[in-house]
Amino acid sequence: MGRRYFGTDGIRGTVGEAPITPDFVLRLGYAAGKVLAGTADVAAGARPTVLIGKDTRVSGYMLEAALEAGFSAAGVDVMLAGPMPTPGVAYLTRALRLSAGVVISASHNPYQDNGIKFFSADGNKLPDETEAAIEAWLDKPLECASSDRLGKARRLEDAAGRYIEFCKSTFPAAYDLRGLKLVIDCAHGAAYQIAPHVFHELGADVIPIGVAPNGFNINDGVGATAPDALVRAVRANHADLGIALDGDADRLQVVDSTGRLYNGDELLYVLVKDRIATAGKVDGAVGTLMTNLAVEVALQREGVPFVRAAVGDRYVLEQLRERGWQLGAEGSGHILSLDRHSTGDGIVSALLVLAALKRSDRTLAQMLDGVTLFPQKLINVRMKPGADWKGSASIRAAIDAAEGALAGSGRVLIRASGTEPVLRVMVEAQQAADATRHAEAIADAVRIATS
């Protein structure tokens, strides 16, 4: 039986619509608390404690209170971190030896949305079986713990300071950021009180933007999903580099002094090159089905095995763990470095990139010399719900024709949307005209076969 509420990154939706309602979130806290209360540590007499962090959406107050009430009713103590990046909650949960961590955030989505995601005691996302157990408890009646067993709540006053020190600890002690002017865009999100301090305390001249949240402006024209604001600020301030985080600070985009934007694919290559220079070799790297072919080719030139996971940082993480590798990324800016953190961390990833530039005494453009991203053409084709596009001979013929013409110098990727009756047709080629021509030919075949 499939999961009803948990997606690939927790539970997410529009606030006020199921399941992101205060009554459901209270029951979710209770259900998660009952699952935690059944662990071996609790059975041995320890009282479970969870950490709750959130981003800056106005709905965070309501959902935080609902979660807190649910955990308390289940006999679970709560620590409240306040605004805290998702990776900060993961780190603090592990560092404080807590039973679990909870993040109230919808990441890069607008303020009208929100979500709940959980971390296990070791700072990793919950395994499927634990999420299934929580969903099973949601069907049971809420039976409040007796008064002497109710959970207590308190604020973790030094949460931000602890996480700032952790982030700084991932930057090599032999270097600092003195002499660098950095624009830091916090998306009016969870990192607005944290990220500027990290880079400033390492010596950088920091120009912060996106640091005035009002509950309604998270990701609104700023942050990693709207990098134009960062480009403008870098140019206007003659900065050396710009770093944009998203609402919960688990992803980033980077802009150099010329205004050139670097995505997660390119930053992955930079980090691999840095590891080769410092460690001698890299066992392998993981991207996704959408990772630009030019990066795969460049990694092959360096002798680094490359594996493509399904789209989503959860799947990149699965592949890294399965192979015992350290480095992975999505083009959207989720970067994983498992020897630094258990989850994607925009601030830590930025520090890794800055360390690579310091060690090499080169710019990003210089480190990526010879790596030119292949043009990609993406066409979304609407089709009838339930249309059998996989069984269409004409679509298969169009794909085969494109792949034959590209002959190893490009890629064709066809995948269905998970939320609407749309087929996404992506073609990547060395020449933009070739990518467009083949994508349009396949899209035409899809329209004819599925309309």
UniProtKB/Swiss-Prot annotation:
- Pfam families per the UniProt record, alphabetical: PGM_PMM_I, PGM_PMM_II, PGM_PMM_III, PGM_PMM_IV
Tell me how the cofactor is bound. Binds 1 Mg(2+) ion per subunit.
> Which keywords appear in this protein's UniProt record, sorted alphabetically?
Isomerase, Magnesium, Metal-binding, Phosphoprotein
Q: Which PROSITE patterns match?
A: PGM_PMM (PS00710)
Question: Carries keyword Magnesium?
Answer: yes
A GO cellular-component term linked to this record: cytosol
Quote one Gene Ontology molecular function term. phosphoglucosamine mutase activity
Q: What does this protein do?
A: Catalyzes the conversion of glucosamine-6-phosphate to glucosamine-1-phosphate.
Which family does the similarity line name?
Belongs to the phosphohexose mutase family.
The family database entries (CDD domains) matched by this protein are listed as: GlmM
The entry's protein name is Phosphoglucosamine mutase
Q: Which cofactor does it need?
A: Mg(2+)
Q: Which SUPFAM superfamilies does the record associate with it?
A: Phosphoglucomutase, C-terminal domain (SSF55957), Phosphoglucomutase, first 3 domains (SSF53738)
Which reaction is recorded as catalysed by this protein?
alpha-D-glucosamine 1-phosphate = D-glucosamine 6-phosphate
Q: How is it modified after translation?
A: Activated by phosphorylation.
Modified sites of kind Phosphoserine: S107
| Entry superkingdom | Bacteria
Q: Detail which positions bind Mg(2+).
A: S107, D246, D248, D250
What GO terms describe the biological role, i.e. biological process, of this protein?
Answer: carbohydrate metabolic process; peptidoglycan biosynthetic process; UDP-N-acetylglucosamine biosynthetic process
